[in-house]
Regions:
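Claisen-condensing/thiolase-fold acyl-transfer catalytic domains that form or cleave C-C bonds
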Residues: 36, 58-136
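Hydrophobic pocket-lining "lid/loop/helix" segments that shape and contact the acyl-thioester
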Residues: 1-87
């Protein structure tokens, strides 16, 4: 799990007041680069720490923010998209709920089975990012 406030201006809510609503401000190209670099590096770090490679992953269950980010991370860690649970086309970006929704979808449709090795990855504004590697 990581956090780095240097990226705050790339993706944030523009109002700190609790009395007024703010809006999300995002630098799309910058967010894409940060997300792909951080999530790819973290996937490799997590796998290395567990003495595994991308070949050991049955399914990657990523945060469902952007299909381009998901595809770029999968490509960088040599994981085919056929091993990625992707629900953007059904649910869109549901923020913090996207990983649990993707997991539920994969379980309910029978793709994710007992004993599968799952790599979860998420990233959020400000920025914070993390991963979990677990056997289902």
């Amino acid at each position: 799990l990581y956090s780095d406030g240097r990226f705050l201006s790339s993706l944030h809510v523009n109002n700190n007041s609790i009395n007024e609503l703010g809006t999300i401000e995002m630098s799309g190209n910058e967010v894409f680069k940060i997300a792909v670099n951080r999530l790819s590096d973290l996937a490799e770090e997590t796998l290395k720490d567990c003495n595994m490679t991308s070949d050991d992953i049955t399914w990657m269950v990523p945060h469902q923010a952007n299909i381009r980010i998901i595809k770029a991370v999968a490509k960088r860690i040599n994981l085919p998209m056929s091993k990625v649970i992707q629900t953007l086309d059904t649910h869109g970006n549901t923020s913090a709920a996207s990983i649990p929704l993707a997991l539920d979808t994969g379980v309910r449709d029978g793709r994710i089975k007992k004993g599968d090795m799952l790599l979860f990855e998420g990233i959020g504004g400000g920025f914070s990012w993390g991963s979990v590697l677990t056997e289902y």
